[in-house]
């Protein structure tokens, strides 16, 4: 470890000829060095305390979460569980819907497909979905824009209905509402189109088998609910049910820079692509939400903003929590299902619950010991 003590601050010891002067100089120099070391010790210990999450702070956050119908809370740091709490019928073994938190697993699958040479993020979608080639807008859409939801295609929440027999076919026929890259529209359509693109890249092989083989099985997640339609197409926007501990494994993958327990699932350089925002929404990467606008941007309730018509939502400078580190990334699901990942603190925070009025910013301030 390199200690940040400026050597110029420590006066050079000069041995004087007389015994009295020598003793005086030794006392002076020793006192000064000890004082400097004491200051340095205070700096080091205070920095460590700031970065170390405390169980007492997590307990206060858990009390708040429980009051808002929270069913689970898990806090990990440096690979260790430092706090775990269940309430309102939740349990360590009880799986719970993570809703749109499902998207982030498909985001990792997309990066795996890049690694495997199946696609490139900035490839035009129309190279694969050739029906789009004649459309002046759709022909410009890239795979990256599907994943960060800036392709300008209608969000189409109706795709989640079980009555739709072929979601993929329905999704690729949806209209654009603006120039690609110019707006952020949240909805299931974008990943549904990606699912069709991946299916064609796999030459008809099962896309769910690809996600299982390259992502979920490697995380030890077991059987997942893909909400398949009559044609066997999965619904990538939602569907997974996980325990808090299972969901935290995705956080471990992120903290491991794509490596999970010694196995490189995606290259670190590719994983970084998931955490780059777009011009249309700097707070959303490739299926992950970002806190990079903190501490200067206003805090936003992402779920409430997503309920607004896309024309009314303001994404240009919003953050999740001003007091949380800017490198925090989040897998977010309806009803305030949350997987907060903070690389600078080597921390993972899972919160699951039923839909209730809940503040991410207040919750995070409690966990981080920064008031509330």
Language model features with spans:
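Boundary at the C-terminal end of the N-terminal hydrophobic targeting segment
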Residues: 49-51, 55
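Active-site Gly/Thr loop motif
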Residues: 221-224, 277-348
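Bacterial peptidoglycan biogenesis and beta-lactam-recognition machinery
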Residues: 112-119, 199-208, 216-224, 243-266, ...
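A short, well-structured edge-of-sheet supersecondary motif
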Residues: 60-90, 339-342, 346-350
């Amino acid at each position: 470890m390199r200690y940040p003590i400026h050597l110029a601050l420590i006066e050079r010891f000069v041995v004087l000829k007389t015994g009295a002067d020598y003793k005086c100089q030794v006392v002076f120099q020793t006192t000064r060095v000890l004082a400097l070391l004491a200051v340095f010790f205070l700096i080091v210990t205070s920095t460590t305390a700031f970065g170390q999450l405390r169980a007492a702070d997590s307990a206060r956050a858990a009390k708040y979460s429980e009051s808002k119908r929270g069913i689970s809370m898990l806090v990990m740091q440096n690979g260790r569980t430092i706090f775990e709490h269940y309430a309102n019928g939740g349990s360590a073994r009880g799986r719970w819907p993570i809703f749109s938190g499902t998207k982030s697993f498909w985001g990792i699958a997309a990066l795996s497909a890049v690694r495997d040479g199946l696609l490139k993020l900035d490839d035009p979608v129309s190279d694969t979905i050739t029906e789009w080639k004649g459309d002046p807008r759709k022909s410009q859409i890239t795979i990256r824009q599907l994943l960060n939801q800036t392709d300008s295609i209608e969000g189409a929440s109706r795709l989640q209905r079980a009555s739709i027999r072929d979601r993929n076919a329905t999704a690729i026929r949806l209209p654009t509402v603006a120039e690609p890259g110019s707006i952020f529209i949240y909805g299931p359509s974008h990943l549904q189109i990606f699912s069709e693109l991946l299916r064609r890249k796999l030459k008809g092989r099962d896309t769910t088998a690809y996600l299982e083989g390259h992502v979920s099985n490697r995380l030890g997640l077991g059987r997942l609910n893909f909400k398949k339609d009559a044609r066997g197409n999965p619904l990538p926007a939602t569907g997974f049910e996980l325990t808090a501990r299972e969901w935290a494994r995705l956080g471990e993958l992120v903290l491991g820079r794509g490596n999970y327990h010694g196995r490189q699932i995606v290259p670190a350089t590719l994983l970084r692509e998931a955490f780059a925002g777009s011009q249309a929404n700097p707070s959303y990467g490739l299926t992950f939400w970002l806190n990079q606008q903190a501490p200067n941007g206003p805090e936003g309730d992402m779920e409430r903003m997503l309920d607004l018509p896309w024309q009314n939502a303001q994404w240009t400078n919003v953050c999740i929590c001003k007091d949380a580190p800017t490198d925090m990334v989040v897998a977010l699901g309806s009803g305030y299902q949350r997987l907060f990942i903070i690389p600078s603190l080597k921390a993972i925070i899972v919160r699951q619950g039923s839909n209730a009025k809940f503040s991410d910013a207040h919750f995070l301030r409690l966990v981080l010991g920064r008031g509330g």
